[in-house]
Regions:
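Beta-strand-enriched cores of mature, soluble protein domains
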Residues: 8-162
Length: 162
């Protein structure tokens, strides 16, 4: 049985409840970082002022598992509470030997006092190729964090979700 140590200022105890015999490799759902991209907001438009709902298109370049890629994403964001946005969108990654991977994504964004929005969410990838440098993305879920600053600059990091 695997046990964990819980440490408090005046108390130390061992408890099998936390690990329950689960191998440590199965407890970590966040896999390796598979991508890092930087780019720019290309355009925005208001879809509905009674929400409001805004459509945003981003264009980024970077690397996905060592392959240079270009990413284009269009998403719709709308406020769900004070300072919090919900976004849903679609994207395309192009790289390698004319390879392409598509994805659907969903995220929550938090608006900072500086005007930037920090997004946390997931991409659900699909490819039609079984070979090539982006083929590994087929049916992969990638969790991401992205930031769009007040000037429209975008940074994004993606990890595989095991």
């Amino acid at each position: 049985m695997i046990t964990s140590m819980i440490s408090y200022p005046s108390l130390t105890t061992t408890s099998p409840i936390f690990d329950a015999g689960i191998p440590s490799t199965d407890k970590n759902m966040l896999g390796e970082q598979i991508g890092e991209l930087k780019g720019k907001t290309m355009g925005q438009r208001v879809l509905d002022s009674e929400g409001p709902r805004m459509e945003t298109t981003l264009s980024s370049t970077g690397s996905v598992r060592g392959t240079n890629v270009k990413e284009t994403v269009t998403f719709v964001g709308s406020p769900i509470s004070a300072g919090v946005l919900h976004g849903e969108g679609h994207g395309v990654l192009m790289g390698g030997e004319s390879e392409m991977a598509t994805f659907r994504g969903e995220a929550f964004g938090r608006i900072s006092s500086s005007g930037s929005v920090k997004w946390r969410g997931a991409h659900f990838y699909r490819t039609t190729s079984s070979t090539g440098k982006l083929a590994f993305l087929n049916n992969v879920v990638g969790v991401f964090e992205a930031e769009i600053d007040a000037e429209g600059n975008v940074t994004e990091k993606i990890w595989e979700w095991k």
